[in-house]
Amino acid sequence: MLKLQLSNGQIIEVEEGSTLLPLAQKLSDKYASPIVMGLYNCEECDLQRPLTADGTVDFVEVNNSVGMRVYVRTLLFMLIAATKKLYPDVHLEVRNSLGSALYCKDNSERKLTAEDIRSIEEYMHRMVQRKEPVKLLRLPKSEAIDMACANCSDDNLALLAQVPDDTVLTINLLEGVPGYLFGPMCPDAGYVPYFELLPYADGVIINYPDDGNWQVLPPFVDQPRLNDAYQEAEEWSAMIHCNTVGKLNKIIDLGYAEKIIQVAEALHEKKLANIADILESHHELKLVLIAGPSSSGKTSTAQRLSIQMAVNGLRPIAISMDDYYKNRVDSPRKADGSYDFECLEAIDLELFNEHLQRLLAGEKVKMPKYNFRTGCREYRGNELQLQENSVLVIEGIHGLNEKLTPSVPAEHKIKIYVSALTPMSFDEYNRIRTTDMRLLRRMVRDSQFRSHDAETTLKTWSDVREGEEKYIFPYQSSADIIFNTTLIYEFAVLKKYAEPLLRAVPQSAGMAYTTARRLLNILSYVKPLEDEVIPNNSILREFIGGSVFKDAL
């Protein structure tokens, strides 16, 4: 018998080899939404996975971001299985997220029609009604590969082949269709009733509920410019044969990593030069606003873009939004009483816009400097006056929000959205989430420059994400230009820095430990890459150190 300690301290005994599913069903009335996953010794655990040792047990319900990942993973497997059943010659590839939706590209010669997509959706809803079981098999590596061969690409099989020979792998089965998707799934299709399929571009959109509101299906909001940025990155990475982890590993093994680094960095330089050309052709331009989510590389982007602007004869002048914070005593507060420095109201908008108007009128302006120690704005004698061809460059969280700069006419400003839209995936079904890549960047940077351990970064990440959802993502469609800061090789470089930090997160850290173990698992598939040849102006240097722009970071 195994002894399990529940979250309330109760000790229960279960037979070795039993699963968490009966216990989850027994405790379901204590949760506001369905339980979709267990936490077994603080690690993610499928409800159908056999238990082999004593440990602690907790449960994750669907109505949060962690539970919604299980929901979406199950939904995706249903889409894969339904498509295989109805249209065996169709091959879907999971591409990228668009709000609370996933875009899957149809890579087959026989393209899905709108009627085909309706048929697949109806088939999936019948799965829900039947509560079609999502079976879980724990198989030795060789057996798992044999089973997966029928439904896996070369990239998927390459990942399976890479794990140690004595590994026991988890393969899922839905209506006889095998799948190897990273992470737990719901026990049956009845857990995921809310979704819709929509024809989109060269494939299909799978739309699903937002985190925290699992019973409401929001309308799909198209973001064509963002999707175009994703598709451009994915097509480029495929063109240079480095769009999956397996291909990156092969490049590293063959000794071609330095070339991939050079090519990726050259792409950034080319893109920034193109943006500078657009800015130079915008003859009435007075203001460039740069915004994006955490750890997108906004500061390095602003610095490198300023250099390219100077090449074109412009005079970029940086203004820090931090210097326009209200004095701390006047700052807005959150519901818990703490200061809210992320909301737009934390900025002295009246003073900021007054200074913008005066600067654009050619006046000399005394510039403030915010003292974070005292929580007050100070004036230290710094004055600013724009010259001919001067362009203000402002980087900040609210740059895309029109309420930040209402005093500046639209013809005088350009908004740039910056984010790490990674095209890298493990295979056609297991993508690398952009939020995970940014979290790894932030964790490494916090350790390198802010003396924060990984536990601290992981515990505050949900607050960071909440701010992004509130202050950045709603405005990204208003951007005039999107710049993708991802680097095709960075996953392998971040591995070297991130793994020791993640291993140091103690089990007592709760969900931070759970996230650390999940990130360690995905990092285990990529081979490490040394960083000596990464140039000192690389956006990645903003996070790993050695940046020529260190004074601006």
Segments predicted by a language model, with ranges:
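Auxiliary tRNA-acceptor-end handling modules of aminoacyl-tRNA synthetases
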Residues: 49, 56-68, 91-270, 275, ...
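Conserved NTP phosphate-binding and transfer environment spanning the P-loop NTPase/kinase superfamily
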Residues: 283, 405-553
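Conserved lysine of the Walker
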Residues: 298
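Hydrophobic positions on the alpha1 helix immediately C-terminal to the Walker A/P-loop
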Residues: 301, 305
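Conserved nucleotide-sensing/catalytic segment adjacent to the nucleotide-binding pocket
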Residues: 317, 326, 330-373
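Glycine-rich phosphate-binding loop used to anchor ATP phosphates in small-molecule kinases
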Residues: 353-411, 457-475
